[in-house]
Amino acid sequence: MRLTQLRRATLSVICLLTTTALFAEPVTYEIDPRHTFPSFEAEHQGGLSVWRGKIRSTSGTIVIDREAQTGNVDVTMDMSTIDFGMDAMTDHAKAEDILDVAQFPTATYTGEMSQFTAQGGPTAIEGQLTLHGVTNPLNLRVNSFQCNPPAMGRSVCGADASGSFNRDDYGVDFGMGRFLMYVNLEIQVEGVLVED
């Protein structure tokens, strides 16, 4: 029994030391597109319901130094893969009078982590969203952030971030006067550690 407890304690110390070493300098995570799905939320029929368009193809990187409490994100979203779950609505969202994905196939978000918890997890990002060929400031709240211990295998960090913007600021003014202009951006993301 004591031997088992000693082994568990030793493993815990090893995990702690390994994790501390891992986050003692900036580390880079590559966004895992299989577990990363940003979405745009917009009201439908004058507020009757909320529709969510999920982006099915995303790439980018996350760099973080939890000890120094610094970091940055760089996310590219393939707007041609947006999916509202209804073919007619998805096709219209991609059309020239809304997102015009033929001319503006990607949207990007880049930013610097600006606030952290005492444990080194980011809670806010100050950045810029480029959508429909227009770039504007957009700050995100990091609602959750967690990394698994390296002893579990590959090192993976995940986060959920959110923010809102006026789509008219990006030239997406379809339905102005009939629909609300404010849109929520939700980003669920997982990144895999880039090994040296």
At which residue positions do the language-model features occur?
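Bacterial N-terminal signal peptides that target proteins for export
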Residues: 2-11
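Hydrophobic membrane-targeting and insertion signals
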Residues: 3, 23-24
